[in-house]
């Protein structure tokens, strides 16, 4: 503590280790800080600049790569987690009703607020987040900084719900940006990977509380391919879990509802005994008898879902939005997720099935299930809203809002700007609102479990998975365990590998990154991102984790 500036000691923690939630990487920063207000964050930035330190800002640590690893200063905003302002937006008064309907509420929160904390606040106030990913453990800043998404034909990245953001630059100045005010900063901060500044406040467009009515069906793999063109457009929300060794999938589709709550069917591995038994079987198949893996999947699938195709029947449930959209991610895991155009899905899945089948027959490698298959509508007009006088606005038009009810499908967006580092394919935006598969992005998530926190070999499977996705025009999710490509001659592979191993990584899940293709992938958007980065951080205070950023071509000279 002797080398910590006096002004920072009131909010330095006793914690000495930072690790990912999955336990895949860990580091020992020089100090871990938990500021409680903007002034303390400003002081942290000031002292970092004066002492030549870098700052890594972290939340829940759910990114399983070395993205957040540092040997310098680390900032956690868990104590900076208050709801500050509610701004309700009403429909016009009806001649027969003196109580106007609330269409949405813009909620301003401190950036360290965890999503589960926000969900609890919203529930108490009869509100809800419009679209969620699979978990609610992240902070609101972390949620938007890495490109989190759900699974729906109508919604894009979760950052689509963000109206405005405040952040501190390396001079400690508080900057406000939105689709109307400093839109170039807004597009950078909406997927910043922590390299633009420290987010302090987020204004999120929330909606009246709603429930989710879902139908869960068991279908054969061939049924999925045969119905591919229609499945994605039949409901507001959709998720598919593919279990390759059973040749079956779980198809989950849902819409907003006003029906009374009705619990989903009991979960076998949702019980303590079922969960422990499943993880034990995984441990045995990973470390002792890999060829048992297909039999473990078949057994667990039968216990959890049965073995009969139920297309058209299925299990019905009505849940609150959070319970309906979140899911149980089970155990510590490696996760490799890529996006591609939805229309390439059948070809991708057919090729992946052949790879998995061939590998299991030779014993070369085995995969874990499920492989998650999702979609999002990540298309943008790249323009702000306009009001009745055709002036730029943060709000959709009254005419558009007047046609919406509490159960209307799709979002009331906070913005319609594409983040510079959005790694989904650029697909055509439809101004008339009609959605087709041509506009939808496919997300495929390959998961390998780490039973009881132990490691499993991933490189063979993940490399083939990435080859297939890359060939289909895909790109990786920034926060996941992707491998990447062989680098150019300037890349010091041994030094990079050494750095990853020093952070607790293992040779069989280290990353090569995507520097060779980044400029081809992002072009002028990457240039624009770096222009903003250099303006907001000329001193390099936020270049913590620089090795990861350079490995993936995020930084331009």
From Swiss-Prot:
One term of GO molecular function: L-gulonolactone oxidase activity
Keyword Oxidoreductase: yes
InterPro entries: ALO_C (IPR007173), FAD-bd_PCMH (IPR016166), FAD-bd_PCMH-like_sf (IPR036318), FAD-bd_PCMH_sub1 (IPR016167), FAD-bd_PCMH_sub2 (IPR016169), FAD_lactone_oxidase-like (IPR010031), Oxid_FAD_bind_N (IPR006094), Oxy_OxRdtase_FAD_BS (IPR006093)
One family name in Pfam for this protein: ALO
Enzyme Commission no: 1.1.3.37, 1.1.3.8, 1.3.3.12
Residues reported in the UniProt entry to bind FAD: 58-63, 144-148, 199, 543-546
Reported cofactor(s): FAD
Superkingdom as given in the UniProt entry: Eukaryota
PTM sites of type Pros-8alpha-FAD histidine: 62
Any GO BP: filamentous growth of a population of unicellular organisms
SUPFAM superfamilies: FAD-binding/transporter-associated domain-like
Keywords assigned by UniProt, alphabetized: FAD, Flavoprotein, Oxidoreductase, Virulence
Catalyses which reaction(s): D-arabinono-1,4-lactone + O2 = dehydro-D-arabinono-1,4-lactone + H2O2 + H(+); L-galactono-1,4-lactone + O2 = L-ascorbate + H2O2 + H(+); L-gulono-1,4-lactone + O2 = L-ascorbate + H2O2 + H(+); L-xylono-1,4-lactone + O2 = dehydro-L-arabinono-1,4-lactone + H2O2 + H(+)
Keyword Transport annotated: no
GO CC field: mitochondrion; plasma membrane
Disruption phenotype: Abolishes D-arabinono-1,4-lactone oxidase activity and impairs the production of D-erythroascorbic acid. Leads to increased sensitivity towards oxidative stress, defective hyphal growth and attenuated virulence.
Residue ranges constituting the FAD-binding PCMH-type domain according to the UniProt record: 25-209
Pathway: Cofactor biosynthesis; D-erythroascorbate biosynthesis; dehydro-D-arabinono-1,4-lactone from D-arabinose: step 2/2
NCBIfam families for the chain: FAD_lactone_ox
Function text: D-arabinono-1,4-lactone oxidase that catalyzes the final step of biosynthesis of D-erythroascorbic acid, an important antioxidant and one of the virulence factors enhancing the pathogenicity. Is also able to oxidize L-galactono-1,4-lactone, L-xylono-1,4-lactone and L-gulono-1,4-lactone.
Family: Belongs to the oxygen-dependent FAD-linked oxidoreductase family.
Record-given protein name: D-arabinono-1,4-lactone oxidase
Source organism: Candida albicans (strain SC5314 / ATCC MYA-2876) (Yeast)
């Amino acid at each position: 503590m002797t080398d910590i500036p006096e002004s920072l000691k009131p909010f330095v923690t006793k914690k000495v280790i930072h690790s990912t939630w999955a336990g895949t990487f860990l580091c020992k920063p020089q100090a871990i800080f938990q500021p409680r207000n903007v002034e303390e964050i400003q002081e942290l930035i000031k002292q970092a600049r004066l002492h030549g330190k870098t700052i890594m800002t972290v939340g829940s640590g759910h990114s399983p790569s070395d993205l957040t690893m540092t040997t310098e200063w680390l900032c956690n905003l868990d104590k900076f987690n208050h709801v500050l302002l509610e701004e309700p937006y009403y429909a016009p008064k009806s001649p027969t009703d003196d109580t106007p309907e609330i269409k949405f509420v813009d909620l301003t929160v401190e950036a360290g607020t965890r999503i589960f904390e926000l969900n609890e606040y919203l529930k108490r106030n009869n509100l809800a987040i419009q679209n969620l990913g699979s978990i609610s453990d992240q902070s609101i800043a972390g949620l938007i900084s890495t490109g989190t998404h759900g699974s729906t034909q109508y919604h894009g990245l979760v950052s689509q719900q963000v109206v405005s953001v405040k952040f501190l630059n390396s001079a400690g100045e508080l900057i406000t940006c939105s689709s109307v005010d400093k839109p170039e900063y807004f597009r950078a901060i909406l997927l910043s990977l922590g390299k633009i500044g420290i987010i302090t406040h987020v204004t999120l467009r929330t909606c009246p509380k709603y429930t989710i009515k879902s139908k869960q069906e068991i279908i054969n793999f061939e049924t999925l391919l045969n119905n591919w063109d229609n499945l994605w457009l039949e409901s507001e929300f959709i998720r598919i879990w593919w279990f390759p060794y059973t040749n079956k999938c779980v198809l989950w589709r849902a819409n907003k509802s006003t029906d009374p709550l009705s619990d989903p069917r009991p979960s076998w591995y949702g019980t303590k005994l079922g969960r422990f038994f499943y993880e034990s079987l995984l441990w045995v198949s990973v470390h002792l008898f890999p060829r048992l893996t297909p039999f473990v999947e078949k057994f667990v699938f039968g216990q959890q879902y049965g073995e009969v195709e139920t297309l058209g029947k299925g299990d019905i449930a009505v849940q609150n939005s959070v319970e309906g959209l979140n899911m149980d991610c089970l155990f510590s895991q490696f996760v490799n997720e890529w996006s591609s155009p939805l229309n390439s899905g059948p070809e991708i899945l057919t090729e992946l099935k052949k790879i998995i089948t061939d590998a299991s027959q030779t014993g070369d490698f085995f995969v874990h299930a499920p492989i998650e298959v999702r979609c999002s509508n990540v298309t943008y007009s790249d323009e702000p809203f306009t009001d009745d006088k055709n002036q730029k606005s943060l709000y959709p038009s009254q005419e558009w809002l007047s046609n919406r009810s509490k159960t209307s499908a799709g979002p009331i967006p906070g913005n319609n700007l594409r983040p510079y580092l959005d790694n989904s394919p650029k697909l055509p935006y439809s101004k008339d609102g009609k959605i087709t598969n041509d506009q939808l992005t496919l997300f495929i998530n390959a998961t390998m479990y780490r039973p009881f926190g132990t490691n499993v070999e991933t490189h063979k499977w993940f490399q083939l998975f990435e080859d297939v996705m890359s060939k289909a025009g895909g790109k990786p999710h920034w926060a996941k365990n992707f491998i990447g490509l062989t680098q150019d001659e300037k890349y010091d592979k041994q030094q990079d590998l050494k750095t990853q191993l020093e952070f607790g990584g293992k040779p069989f899940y280290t990353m090569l990154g995507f520097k060779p293709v980044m400029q081809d992938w992002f072009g002028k958007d990457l240039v624009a991102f770096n222009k903003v980065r250099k303006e907001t951080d000329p001193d390099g205070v936020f270049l913590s984790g620089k090795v990861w950023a350079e490995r993936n071509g995020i930084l331009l000279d």
